[in-house]
Swiss-Prot record:
Entry binding sites for UDP-N-acetyl-alpha-D-muramoyl-L-alanyl-D-glutamate: S30, T153, T154, S180, Q186, R188
Annotated source species: Phocaeicola vulgatus (strain ATCC 8482 / DSM 1447 / JCM 5826 / CCUG 4940 / NBRC 14291 / NCTC 11154) (Bacteroides vulgatus)
NCBIfam families: murE, PRK00139.1-4
Pathway: Cell wall biogenesis; peptidoglycan biosynthesis
ATP-binding as UniProt keyword: yes
Protein's GO biological process: cell division; cell wall organization; peptidoglycan biosynthetic process; regulation of cell shape
Protein's name according to its UniProt entry: UDP-N-acetylmuramoyl-L-alanyl-D-glutamate--2,6-diaminopimelate ligase
Cystine connections: none
Alphabetical list of Gene3D superfamilies matching this protein: Mur ligase, C-terminal domain, Mur-like, catalytic domain, MurE/MurF, N-terminal domain
């Protein structure tokens, strides 16, 4: 594709060089540059791409998009100066990869909790309907049946457009995508056209990056502010920020709720470890999910499917056949008669939701043992809150490590313990070794008890000092059960 066509949709301050040349690729990472590529110099949170311009040229970059021109300009290299490279990179990638979202029905899911479940269930549902479908999520990306491993909730804009381009080329009609607050703030979704957006909820998370809850809210809201008139905005009325999210959107607003009058109204009629009986818009449906938070997620899935033109009867039938997402309220039964639940809950609110769900089903007939940690080099303010929530709703709590990254595990544990009283501490054991913590919980559990292993969910690693060591909560539990 010619450079002049790729840059047509962006505001350019200055062009130095030949804009008619053929471009073979686009990248923000100088290490991935190949001959004939565009290098976009983006100022990131860790490094400034402008310092790698020379390296990119040495690797064969024919064009450099930058905010500041380098002191020395190289002959036969085209320089394009713009105000904000972070803002234009998504638009450049969208054009280069053939505007993939004009050929797909793309739905974005944003919120603190529930994104993975909702996006994945919509992907599974639309495949059941017989459509080729794409998924972009924390757990894994999919182009119909093909799995593509992922590192981020939302990939960088170039990877994202390349992925969406492949989905469109391979005949996908729908794509469902988690939209993180980071991706909105860093303009990773720039240039994409959404058919719809879903808001789940907003609670404390990622304050290491956003600094304040208000900034976090603004990042989520910006997604809805950017939706076109042709899109739908489906929001959760049970969250106090539900209507705030959609107050400035051009999209058509629809609502879902378990408590209030709404377009998609739900009610939990029965709840057990095998599933729930729900009432959705006055029709009963059995589902294989547990807990009110999952009832809310399923309402969002139901609403989105209906807004995408599916008939209510086929949506309800599909809902009844869907299974929980990996690492989200994943339950395993021990030979000793207790239940272990592995869940990704890594915020105080998510922990509260999962523990509430456990108590609703247990109904006082067993004890709750919670194994929980907090991530290193992340929002320190939520650490004591996580411990407090665990203690409030558990009979025994084992504080342990969870991706300590570049911090010492014991220091993170100490931060969590700092939020507890002497009375609370009677319930608490701290064991830095996560495997030992899970083993101890299993030794303490009796028949009918429930162990919650929180924080990692689908993750199969422990990140320590920059290295990801293999670690899987479910594997550990299965090994323990095999020897009981």
């Amino acid at each position: 594709m010619k450079l002049e066509k790729i840059i047509k949709g962006i505001t350019v301050n200055e062009i130095i060089g030949d804009a008619s040349q053929e471009i073979s690729g686009i990248n923000m990472d100088s290490r991935l540059i190949e001959p004939g590529h565009i290098f976009v110099a983006v100022k990131g949170t860790q490094t400034d791409g402008h310092t790698y311009i020379q390296k990119a040229i040495e690797k064969g970059a024919r064009t450099v998009v930058c905010e500041n021109l380098p002191e020395t300009l190289i002959e036969n290299v085209t320089y394009i100066k713009v105000n904000d490279t972070e803002d234009v990179v998504g638009k450049l990638a969208t054009t280069f990869y053939g505007d993939p979202t004009s050929k797909l029905e793309l739905v974005g899911v944003t919120g603190t909790n529930g994104k993975t479940t909702i996006a994945t269930l919509l992907y599974n549902m639309f495949r059941k309907f017989g459509y080729k479908t794409g998924l972009i999520s924390t757990v894994c990306n999919y182009i119909d049946e093909e799995a593509i491993p992922t590192d981020h909730t939302t990939p960088d804009p170039i990877t994202l457009n390349k992925l969406l381009g492949r989905m469109a080329d391979e005949g996908c009609k729908y794509a469902f995508m988690e939209v993180s607050s980071h991706s909105v703030a860093q303009k990773r979704i720039g240039g994409l056209k959404f058919a719809g957006g879903i808001f789940t909820n907003l609670t404390r998370d990622h304050l290491d990056y956003h600094k304040t809850v208000e900034n976090y809210l603004k990042a989520k809201k910006a997604f809805f502010d950017g939706l076109p008139k042709t899109a739908f905005a489906l929001t959760n009325l049970d969250d106090k920020n539900g209507l705030v999210m959609t107050q400035n959107t051009k999209a058509k607003v629809h609502t879902y709720s378990l408590r209030s009058l709404s377009d998609f109204k739900g009610k939990v009629l029965e709840d057990g470890f095998e599933g729930m009986l729900l009432d959705i818009n006055n029709v009963e449906v059995n589902v294989q999910f547990i807990g009110r938070f999952n009832a809310s997620n399923l309402l969002a899935v139901y609403g989105a499917a209906c807004l995408l033109g599916k008939k209510t009867e086929e949506v309800l039938l599909a809902l009844s056949t869907l299974r929980p997402v990996a690492g989200r309220f994943d339950s395993l039964r021990s030979p000793k008669g207790y239940t272990a639940i592995v869940d990704y809950a890594h915020t105080p609110d998510a922990l509260e939701n999962v523990l509430n769900a456990i108590h609703e089903v247990l109904n006082g007939k067993g004890h709750v043992i919670t194994v929980v940690g907090a991530g290193g080099n992340r929002d320190k303010g939520k650490r004591p809150l996580m411990a407090q929530e665990a203690v409030k709703q558990s009979d025994k709590v084992i504080i342990t490590s969870d991706n300590p990254r570049f911090e010492e595990p014991q220091e993170i544990i100490n931060d969590m313990l700092a939020g507890l009283t002497k009375e609370d501490m009677r319930k608490v054991i701290s064991i830095a070794d996560r495997k030992e913590a899970i083993r101890t919980a299993c030794m303490l559990a009796q028949a009918k008890d429930v162990i919650l292993v929180a924080g990692k969910g689908h993750e199969n690693y422990q990140e320590i000092k920059g290295i990801k060591h293999h670690f899987d909560d479910k594997e550990v539990l299965r090994d323990i059960f095999a020897n009981e």
